[in-house]
């Protein structure tokens, strides 16, 4: 289920609040197979017989500001979000088979929390449009998860392949009617990748 509330205290400001909940059915994911194959290892992923569905509860709130300054139209968005995951899916090494293939098992972890803030800005002028955004987030398991059978590798609370910072920008310039140029970019912050 999902519930949304929107309120406009002025013509230039939108306030939004949202709540949602959902689940993911037990399964092994294609990206797990692809990522392991890229690392040069063949992995056989099995689903734990005790695997339960993953559940989530999410809330978010945002302030959206729209205004025109003469010929320039601007928009700024500030959004906060929080998601609580229960029975979060984790992937753990459980050994190797007789052909030396890596054996991994999809299990339930204790849970995880994802929270952060999203900032976006847009500006439009007659011949130019610029948009940029950044997300600062924290994705952590509630308890450190042991992801490898190697005793020298410490368990991690930080979620894998989940950067704390990422962002983007896009821009389009049309100085004359028959010519348009675009410039875009993305930034992905550092992250942990299990291997």
Where does each model-flagged region fall?
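Membrane-embedded beta-barrel scaffold of Gram-negative outer-membrane proteins
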Residues: 8, 16, 50-107, 113
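Outer-membrane beta-barrel translocator/channel fold
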Residues: 14-41, 47-55
